[in-house]
């Protein structure tokens, strides 16, 4: 197996060289301090508790049904690589009875996605799992590099997020799969909670903290087995298991708003390690009660309707992906979201999107 040495920093405070014994087995030397609870434990016990906690999450939330096909959203990064490794391991160990498939999205980011997909292909051979790759070029006739060249980098995550979600659904449908699992971890979910709160978008908290999500009328559900896994522990697991993963950050990620929330959370975590789970639980508790609709009120479009342009599920006449594509197509030569003084077609598209429910 080809092993790529991770560039993700393994914090020295988490990897400890102590003469004291593991706090769990009391037989082997402790080599690391768990970021989640600061326990000093040996590698073997870390593997056991990490894998067992994920198994308990799967079982307690009834994530899998025997006989179903499950697509693992595989990017080649640490989260999806550890997810593929663990799900194959637990499926064999606990006999979930599910058929696992790797599903990758090629956004078309030269120097990033092409290299990460090479890692996915190595993992596919190692784990002997089927692999399906769906590209933005094939689905939308655009690549992210082309989109950023026209729309600017500041809103690249908006375009990518909308297109990726739809691409995963379309890829799963192509494979006749109704369940997609992703490597979103506790840090990701806590960051999303913070982002929604900072933007004053409390209405999105319910979906952002749910371990299982599914649009009304859609046969495809998504689940997050890593909901309670700290990112640092995922890195430690990949490090000690010597898993082959791609660790370079997305070319366009530094400009994303998520990075601001991440820095804020890191500062909070340094003071209070439990803040990650605390933030998720706060998000769950802050979920707004659904308003009762007046019996005479009319709703022209709702969940379960289809986009008039592409046929994809949409709560509006035109789905979000098609709205973005229309803006790109109409403003291919001049669109620039970054230019605040020139309210062009792309900016109007973004303002319209902000009024829609994601």
UniProtKB/Swiss-Prot annotation:
UniProt entry tagged with the keyword Cytoplasm: yes
Stored SUPFAM superfamilies: Adenine nucleotide alpha hydrolases-like
Recorded family membership: Belongs to the TtcA family. CTU1/NCS6/ATPBD3 subfamily.
GO cellular component, one term: cytosolic tRNA wobble base thiouridylase complex
PROSITE patterns to which the protein is assigned, alphabetical: UPF0021 (PS01263)
Metabolic or biological pathway: tRNA modification; 5-methoxycarbonylmethyl-2-thiouridine-tRNA biosynthesis
Name of the featured protein: Cytoplasmic tRNA 2-thiolation protein 1
Keywords: Cytoplasm, RNA-binding, Transferase, tRNA processing, tRNA-binding
Compartments it resides in: Cytoplasm
Keyword Transcription regulation carried by entry: no
EC number: 2.7.7.-
One annotated GO molecular function: tRNA binding
GO biological process: one example: tRNA wobble uridine modification
Pfam families recorded: ATP_bind_3, zn-ribbon_14
InterPro entries reported for this sequence: CTU1-like_ATP-bd, CTU1_C, Ncs6/Tuc1/Ctu1, Rossmann-like_a/b/a_fold, TilS/TtcA_N, tRNA_thiolation_TtcA_Ctu1, UPF0021_CS
Main location group: cytoplasm
General function of this protein: Plays a central role in 2-thiolation of mcm(5)S(2)U at tRNA wobble positions of tRNA(Lys), tRNA(Glu) and tRNA(Gln). Directly binds tRNAs and probably acts by catalyzing adenylation of tRNAs, an intermediate required for 2-thiolation. It is unclear whether it acts as a sulfurtransferase that transfers sulfur from thiocarboxylated URM1 onto the uridine of tRNAs at wobble position. Prior mcm(5) tRNA modification by the elongator complex is required for 2-thiolation. May also be involved in protein urmylation.
Domain of life of the source: Eukaryota
